[in-house]
Amino acid sequence: MSNEAKCPFHQAAGNGTSNRDWWPNQLDLSILHRHSSLSDPMGKDFNYAQAFEKLDLAAVKRDLHALMTTSQDWWPADFGHYGGLFIRMAWHSAGTYRTADGRGGAGEGQQRFAPLNSWPDNANLDKARRLLWPIKQKYGRAISWADLLILTGNVALESMGFKTFGFAGGRADTWEPEDVYWGSEKIWLELSGGPNSRYSGDRQLENPLAAVQMGLIYVNPEGPDGNPDPVAAARDIRDTFARMAMNDEETVALIAGGHTFGKTHGAGPASNVGAEPEAAGIEAQGLGWKSAYRTGKGADAITSGLEVTWTTTPTQWSHNFFENLFGYEWELTKSPAGAHQWVAKGADAVIPDAFDPSKKHRPTMLTTDLSLRFDPAYEKISRRFHENPEQFADAFARAWFKLTHRDMGPRARYLGPEVPAEVLLWQDPIPAVDHPLIDAADAAELKAKVLASGLTVSQLVSTAWAAASTFRGSDKRGGANGARIRLAPQKDWEANQPEQLAAVLETLEAIRTAFNGAQRGGKQVSLADLIVLAGCAGVEQAAKNAGHAVTVPFAPGRADASQEQTDVESMAVLEPVADGFRNYLKGKYRVPAEVLLVDKAQLLTLSAPEMTVLLGGLRVLGANVGQSRHGVFTAREQALTNDFFVNLLDMGTEWKPTAADADVFEGRDRATGELKWTGTRVDLVFGSHSQLRALAEVYGSADAQEKFVRDFVAVWNKVMNLDRFDLA
């Protein structure tokens, strides 16, 4: 018998057939429990913002400047300068961001972890991060990997003569992979049209995805599915960049600006390239893509398989990209690796070689570069940039800053001496508070007026929830601060019940106006604060109705944004297509409603227990959209009781679907057949899913009422303050 067969630990914890293998459709709650303190080596007392503020950023930048031109034999620098490599590293760190759910982006340093560290489009960026390790090692906890990756991209640009728009720190590292849906394909770079394709119909890309193929950051540089058609590629570019929050002008600026520097690598056939980092042997120490082609590095490097250098100035900011784009006619050719690319027809060899100063090459371009000339809208912008270099430089600086900071959320999170003073619309700006805040006595007075106004508990709670629950922990957008629920587009969202919302806001505005008018010394309450305070009053009244006296925590300090400070198109992506906490579905989806509930809970940074107690409380408070009775398992509505759990777990009730699609269910008395309740999948999952049922049993027990109220108040307060970065 072999030693392996004798080993008593061969089937240690974590090995063997998993629940997911047996029941692949089982609701997965694991995304609610990522990034716990158990995986964080920094300890609960570590505050990254405080550590970063003590950092000598100028010293870090000096070290980065020196690194740019200190070529290492184990991975030599193209043209003697690592700038192009580090721009790509920073771009690909930030470029996974997508607007649909706010996931991806540079904010957590996820490029260090699978799957991103092993995506084909990130080939050889493992070398870029290893080049940075001595600097990361030197400054330690004072600068995160997430911040360092972006800062390095900025310094790369600056070291090559480009003036950047600014840099903000504040991206704290996480210590395990984020669980993000990147697509259903099982093969890297799988083409569209297969059984797991992300495309349907007339090349309609699946939401929330933004990249065109599994393992790409943006688009296929050879063209759609490798078809070298610049016009068809432009359609992919426009769709993908829009899903990453970029308009046409920003898109042109980013492509042309980024491709002013460096080169691509396709010295030989891809068959020479070894396994990606996650599949490489343990002796590779986290490095991948080892190439057997000649030396495997420098002039022999293979990354994308394309062999393109765009400009005569690959280590210096210039406008040569547009000069070449419009100055030549282009003919299709193939790289040494066999990839489609384009070469300037009849051109002289004017492009420098990356390693041999005696050699020159003809200008080359990617299919997606030519899209900037042959797509009519892109061409118009490109020619304007060509004729107005200062406009191009400004547009690229702004687009680069947006690319690398889009997922950071509000300016309140920006740290460091290089934060630009200019406030940008895409940052969802909120005015600074310029008046004294209300105190506890004022809050009590306002709550009394709200409760005497005729507004119901359900109206108060549902309005506060609608305002606060737009928050996304992914890109830190949304939340109650700013009171944007009173502005377009939020005031018109179906989930926000526009007619009821308008009536509630009118009443609250009258209370606010009267209160502010009666103050001396400039004290005021913002509508944003009053919306949250009114919701707290509703929760307190509901607890009182259930026999419990509680005070819901409240922290004033929110301000009211204006319509002019709100980008309607950008804000539209926050509209809920599903909110299980309000038993709301905008339409029918392939994904079951309970999966959408867990997704919403994860964006709200909730744990499974928090999700459970919150939903059970909101049901009995009548927070459903349209006053739906689904899931309102109580005869004491607007009282904060644990009735939802008690009645869901009652074995005297038998549940059956009302239709074949099993989205809505009737609960009837087992003995008499009398209809007792109706519920949705989102309601019944708390009785059917074993882990959620275990949580429901905690809150449905005879001794649970006080704990239920206490836990509900805690998670309510958490959601109301998710966007209060000023309180951190």
Swiss-Prot record:
InterPro entries (UniProt xref): Catalase_peroxidase, Haem_peroxidase, Haem_peroxidase_sf, Peroxidases_AS, Peroxidases_heam-ligand_BS
Keyword line: Heme, Hydrogen peroxide, Iron, Metal-binding, Oxidoreductase, Peroxidase
Residues annotated to bind heme b: 259
Function: Bifunctional enzyme with both catalase and broad-spectrum peroxidase activity. Also displays NADH oxidase, isoniazid hydrazine lyase and isonicotinoyl-NAD synthase activities.
Description of how the protein assembles with itself and partners: Homodimer.
Organism lineage: Bacteria, Pseudomonadati, Pseudomonadota, Betaproteobacteria, Burkholderiales
Protein name per UniProt: Catalase-peroxidase
Names of the cofactor(s): heme b
Family indicated by similarity: Belongs to the peroxidase family. Peroxidase/catalase subfamily.
Linked residues for Tryptophyl-tyrosyl-methioninium (Tyr-Met) (with W-91): 218-244
Disulfide pattern: none
Entry EC no(s): 1.11.1.21
Record-annotated site: Transition state stabilizer: 88
One BP term from GO: cellular response to hydrogen peroxide
Transmembrane segments: none
Organism (species): Burkholderia pseudomallei (strain K96243)
UniProt superkingdom: Bacteria
Co-factor remark: Binds 1 heme b (iron(II)-protoporphyrin IX) group per subunit.
Cellular component GO terms held in the UniProt record: cytosol
Record-listed cross-link Tryptophyl-tyrosyl-methioninium (Trp-Tyr) (with M-244), residues: 91-218
Underlying gene: katG
Reported modifications of this chain: Formation of the three residue Trp-Tyr-Met cross-link is important for the catalase, but not the peroxidase activity of the enzyme.
Pfam families assigned to the protein according to its UniProt record, in alphabetical order: peroxidase
pH dependence, entry free text: Optimum pH is 4.5 for the peroxidase reaction, 6.0 for the catalase reaction, and 8.75 for the NADH oxidase reaction.
